[in-house]
Amino acid sequence: MTVAKLSINLSGLEFENPLILASGINDKVPEQWIRAHEEGAGGVVTKSIGIEPRKGYDNPTIVELPYGLINAMGLPNPGWKGFLEMVEGYSFDFPLIVSIFGGTPEEFAFLAEKLSEVADAFELNLSCPHAKGYGMEIGQKPENVYAVVKAVKDATDKPVIAKLTPNIDDITKLGLAAENAGADAVSAINTLKAIAIDIYARKPILSNKVGGYSGPGVKPVALRAVYDLARTLDIPVIGIGGITTWQDAVEFLLAGASALQIGTAVSLRGWKVFREINEGIERYLREEGFSSVEEIVGLALE
C-alpha cells in the first residue's frame, strides 16, 4: 500500500503535513508548541506578540456555545523582550510562525526586525476583532493592510503572512492589498465579531462585552472566504475557521487552501485532532487516487 504524501512546501518552508496550530488560546508557551507537533501538527503559530507586555482582559474571557467559542482575551502577551527570553534555549524541528500585532506599520516592522532571529515566518495580526486600536481596526482598510505588509517586508527576509478579517464586505480587497505589498501568503479567517448575553444578569457575559466567534459555526463563512481569495490571488491561502474533522480539512483544500490552521478544535476535542485529521486526509487521498495533498488544492475552483 502506497501512502499519500502529506508534506507541503509553503513559501519555502517545509511542513510535514498541512495542519498548523493556529494563533489563539492553546499556544502561549513553547511546551504547547512542542506538544502540538508531537500530536501531529506540521507547524505552529504563536500567540500574538506586541511591543509591550499586555495582561489582557479580566475574566470571563471565553464563552462556550453549542457550535464554537466566543473569546475576548485582550491580546495578553509578554512583549517582544519577554518572548525572546521565553524561547531562549529552545530549538524547534518544525516551522515556528510568530504572530505579531501593532498599532502602526512602524510597530509591526520593529517587531519583525527584533524577532527575525527566532521566527521562521511572521503572521501579521490584522484581524483581531476585540482589541481597541489593533487588529481589525487597522486591517479593515486595504491601504492599511498594504502599508503594514510593505513595512514588514522591508524589515525582514522571512516569509510574511497577512491574517485577514472576515468583518468586511469583500475580503478579496484585503487579500489583493497584501499581495500587492509583497506578502508571501494570506491566512483567513480570523474570528467573527460576536456577543453573548446572560439572560438572568441581563448583560453581556464577556468582560469586554464583544469577542470573536470561532469553531464549527464559522466554517461555511471561512470556506467561502478561502474560496474567494484562492480564485483572486496568486499567492497561497492558508485556511482557518471551524476545521474540526478531516472532511472539513479536505473541503478547505479543495476550495484552494494550501495549508490549514486549527485552533478551536483543540480546545473542544483535544490535541488528538491533528493526528485524526491527518489520518483522514491521507486515507481520502489514497482512496480517491491522489498521491499528495498538493494535487487536490483548488480542485473545486475549476
Curated annotation (Swiss-Prot):
<keyword id="KW-0520">NAD</keyword>
<dbReference type="GO" id="GO:0004152">
    <property type="term" value="F:dihydroorotate dehydrogenase activity"/>
</dbReference>
<feature type="binding site">
    <location>
        <begin position="190"/>
        <end position="191"/>
    </location>
    <ligand>
        <name>substrate</name>
    </ligand>
</feature>
<feature type="binding site">
    <location>
        <position position="47"/>
    </location>
    <ligand>
        <name>substrate</name>
    </ligand>
</feature>
<feature type="binding site">
    <location>
        <position position="189"/>
    </location>
    <ligand>
        <name>FMN</name>
    </ligand>
</feature>
<comment type="subunit">
    <text>Heterotetramer of 2 PyrK and 2 PyrD type B subunits.</text>
</comment>
<dbReference type="InterPro" id="IPR005720">
    <property type="entry name" value="Dihydroorotate_DH_cat"/>
</dbReference>
<dbReference type="InterPro" id="IPR050074">
    <property type="entry name" value="DHO_dehydrogenase"/>
</dbReference>
<comment type="similarity">
    <text>Belongs to the dihydroorotate dehydrogenase family. Type 1 subfamily.</text>
</comment>
<feature type="binding site">
    <location>
        <position position="215"/>
    </location>
    <ligand>
        <name>FMN</name>
    </ligand>
</feature>
<keyword id="KW-0665">Pyrimidine biosynthesis</keyword>
<dbReference type="InterPro" id="IPR013785">
    <property type="entry name" value="Aldolase_TIM"/>
</dbReference>
<keyword id="KW-0963">Cytoplasm</keyword>
<dbReference type="InterPro" id="IPR001295">
    <property type="entry name" value="Dihydroorotate_DH_CS"/>
</dbReference>
<dbReference type="InterPro" id="IPR033888">
    <property type="entry name" value="DHOD_1B"/>
</dbReference>
<dbReference type="GO" id="GO:0044205">
    <property type="term" value="P:'de novo' UMP biosynthetic process"/>
</dbReference>
<feature type="binding site">
    <location>
        <position position="23"/>
    </location>
    <ligand>
        <name>FMN</name>
    </ligand>
</feature>
<feature type="active site" description="Nucleophile">
    <location>
        <position position="128"/>
    </location>
</feature>
<protein>
    <recommendedName>
        <fullName>Dihydroorotate dehydrogenase B (NAD(+)), catalytic subunit</fullName>
        <ecNumber>1.3.1.14</ecNumber>
    </recommendedName>
</protein>
<feature type="binding site">
    <location>
        <position position="125"/>
    </location>
    <ligand>
        <name>FMN</name>
    </ligand>
</feature>
<dbReference type="GO" id="GO:0005737">
    <property type="term" value="C:cytoplasm"/>
</dbReference>
<dbReference type="GO" id="GO:0006207">
    <property type="term" value="P:'de novo' pyrimidine nucleobase biosynthetic process"/>
</dbReference>
<comment type="function">
    <text>Catalyzes the conversion of dihydroorotate to orotate with NAD(+) as electron acceptor.</text>
</comment>
<dbReference type="InterPro" id="IPR049622">
    <property type="entry name" value="Dihydroorotate_DH_I"/>
</dbReference>
<dbReference type="InterPro" id="IPR012135">
    <property type="entry name" value="Dihydroorotate_DH_1_2"/>
</dbReference>
<feature type="binding site">
    <location>
        <position position="163"/>
    </location>
    <ligand>
        <name>FMN</name>
    </ligand>
</feature>
<feature type="binding site">
    <location>
        <begin position="241"/>
        <end position="242"/>
    </location>
    <ligand>
        <name>FMN</name>
    </ligand>
</feature>
<dbReference type="Pfam" id="PF01180">
    <property type="entry name" value="DHO_dh"/>
</dbReference>
<feature type="binding site">
    <location>
        <begin position="47"/>
        <end position="48"/>
    </location>
    <ligand>
        <name>FMN</name>
    </ligand>
</feature>
<dbReference type="InterPro" id="IPR024920">
    <property type="entry name" value="Dihydroorotate_DH_1"/>
</dbReference>
<keyword id="KW-0285">Flavoprotein</keyword>
<dbReference type="GO" id="GO:0004589">
    <property type="term" value="F:dihydroorotate dehydrogenase (NAD+) activity"/>
</dbReference>
<keyword id="KW-0560">Oxidoreductase</keyword>
<feature type="binding site">
    <location>
        <begin position="71"/>
        <end position="75"/>
    </location>
    <ligand>
        <name>substrate</name>
    </ligand>
</feature>
<feature type="binding site">
    <location>
        <position position="125"/>
    </location>
    <ligand>
        <name>substrate</name>
    </ligand>
</feature>
<feature type="binding site">
    <location>
        <begin position="263"/>
        <end position="264"/>
    </location>
    <ligand>
        <name>FMN</name>
    </ligand>
</feature>
<comment type="pathway">
    <text>Pyrimidine metabolism; UMP biosynthesis via de novo pathway; orotate from (S)-dihydroorotate (NAD(+) route): step 1/1.</text>
</comment>
<keyword id="KW-0288">FMN</keyword>
